Every structure is written in structure tokens, then in C-alpha cells.
Swiss-Prot record:
Gene3D superfamilies: 3.30.1440.10
Family: Belongs to the universal ribosomal protein uL5 family.
Subunit: Part of the 50S ribosomal subunit; part of the 5S rRNA/L5/L18/L25 subcomplex. Contacts the 5S rRNA and the P site tRNA. Forms a bridge to the 30S subunit in the 70S ribosome.
Keywords, alphabetical: Ribonucleoprotein, Ribosomal protein, RNA-binding, rRNA-binding, tRNA-binding
Any one GO BP annotation for this protein: translation
Originating organism: Idiomarina loihiensis (strain ATCC BAA-735 / DSM 15497 / L2-TR)
Coiled-coil parts of chain: none
HAMAP family in the cross-refs: Ribosomal_uL5_B
MF-aspect GO terms: rRNA binding; structural constituent of ribosome; tRNA binding
GO cellular component: ribonucleoprotein complex; ribosome
Name by which UniProt lists this protein: Large ribosomal subunit protein uL5
Pfam family, one: Ribosomal_L5
The organism's place on the tree of life at top rank: Bacteria
Length: 179
């Protein structure tokens, strides 16, 4: 069992129940899933670029990513419908808690010129999205084997009803939000 999951049940749940005065433990917000997405526009010219991105995302998440394809053709970007343009992975359960632990304790502190996470990146329904400019902040990615520094999007989906509840949930996990 992940340490962060135990921490959630033992510390975060009672803290949030008291703060928001919930009647039941089931009302307390929880993290449902974490989605990692890597858009690789250069994959149109060179197919190996997408293979390298898939390998990086697999190392970061510990799970095989799915390749995403263009939904419709866009002449301005020289993209046709069905072209592979990225990859994504959805983490749930044990892998989600392990990734969240590594994100908070290892990856976020390794971000260059880091001044805190943007507290306005909530979507209005309690989900938080953040972008990472370099995949090399994760220790699983071998720096010598990286062909190009790419970023990725991280979306944390919660079942919180409001942004305030979700912010309190993530702050309880020691997410370093900007003041």
C-alpha cells in the first residue's frame, strides 16, 4: 500500500471532515485519477520521435501509454485525421498514489526556477491541471538517453464539488501552491 494513500486515510480525511463539516467520510473529496499527456507535434515528420516520447512516458508512469491520434484534419498544421500526434496514460489506484508521491517529493522540487504551483489552474469542477516543461525532472528518465527535452501535461481529477475543496485536498498533500 502506498504511504500517501495511508496518509490520506489517516490524516487528510479527518482534517477535511473538520474543515468542511462533512457528515460522512464518503463526502470527503478524493483523487480519482491522474492523466499524463504528451503532445508530440514533431511526430508528423519523424515517427521515431513519438516512439521516444512513449518510452519516456512509460518510464515516468510505469504503465504503457496509448498513442493519441488527430480527431480532424487541420491544413494549417499539416495534420490529417488519424495521424498519431501524441500519447497519454491514465493512472488509477496504486500506480496513481505512487506517481503522486514521486511528483510531490521528487519531481516538483527539481523544476528549475520553481516559484510554486499556480492556484488558479483549477477548472471550476475540482480538477487541477499543470504543465511540466521538461520530462527530465523525473528520476526514471535517463538523461543520457533523452533525444529531446519535451514537456507533459498532468491532470489530477478529483470528485470534489468545488475548487476550494479540491485546493484544500491537494494542499493537505503538501502541494506547493503559490501564495
Amino acid at each position: 500500500m502506498a504511504k500517501l494513500h495511508d496518509f490520506y486515510r489517516e490524516s487528510v480525511v479527518p482534517e477535511l471532515m473538520k474543515e468542511f463539516s462533512y457528515n460522512s467520510v464518503m463526502q470527503v473529496p478524493r483523487i480519482d485519477k491522474i492523466t499524463l499527456n504528451m503532445g508530440v507535434g514533431e511526430a508528423l515528420a519523424d515517427k521515431k520521435v513519438l516512439d521516444n516520447a512513449v518510452a519516456d512516458l512509460e518510464a515516468i508512469s510505469g504503465q504503457k501509454p496509448i498513442r493519441t491520434v488527430a480527431r480532424k484534419s487541420v491544413a494549417g498544421f499539416k495534420v490529417r485525421e488519424g495521424f498519431p500526434i501524441g500519447c497519454k496514460v491514465t493512472l488509477r489506484g496504486e500506480r496513481m498514489w505512487d506517481f503522486l508521491q514521486r511528483l510531490i517529493s521528487i519531481a516538483i522540487p527539481r523544476i528549475r526556477d520553481f516559484r510554486g504551483l499556480n492556484p488558479k489552474s483549477f477548472d471550476g469542477r475540482g480538477n487541477y491541471s499543470m504543465g511540466v516543461r521538461e520530462q527530465i525532472i523525473f528520476p526514471e528518465v535517463d538523461y543520457d538517453k533523452v533525444d529531446k527535452v519535451r514537456g507533459l501535461d498532468i491532470t489530477i481529477t478529483t470528485n470534489a464539488g468545488t475548487d476550494d475543496e479540491a485546493r484544500a485536498l491537494l494542499a493537505a498533500f503538501n502541494f506547493p501552491f503559490r501564495k
